[in-house]
């Protein structure tokens, strides 16, 4: 990952995500936006999370774990997919629903594989409040963003177990030598309320 984003750049991405969803729901077309800074033109992984306000109930979360697209383009696509393509939820159809939705954008570092001699070492290498994780076995994978264990109050074992479940694997699969674990970090920018001020979350402080 390149340099960290400024709060202004994070705010731009959050506003862009909202604009992209509303524009798509109104017109069926994907918005095109030029990156205002060089950092926002870099290829980076990104996830867009939609939460119902004020209870923070999840409404959708989609993204790109790998840095395969320029950040602005990836944010637009992830936002639209989070609103209309998350299989866990009915697709959003009415733009007015966005008036009750809070947006969070997580900008990721490239995933890094953890090398261990014993799977139990994973527990020591993962830091709650810092790391997101990806569990992989063949074509199956499960990703959890770093804010998830903080919000759920999980420890490292629970974090690993839930990532396995998300991959469609048994919860203790992380103990298997066939399992691959990747970690990444994220800058997380969120609206305090729908269309409200944007802040950068400090996950370590939230624990």
UniProtKB/Swiss-Prot annotation:
PROSITE patterns: AMMECR1 (PS51112). Residues 8-200 form the AMMECR1 domain. Gene3D superfamilies: Hypothetical protein ph0010, domain 1, Hypothetical protein ph0010, domain 2. It comes from the Archaea. It holds the Pfam family AMMECR1. This is Protein MK0488. It comes from Methanopyrus kandleri (strain AV19 / DSM 6324 / JCM 9639 / NBRC 100938). The lineage of its organism: Archaea, Methanobacteriati, Methanobacteriota, Methanomada group, Methanopyri.
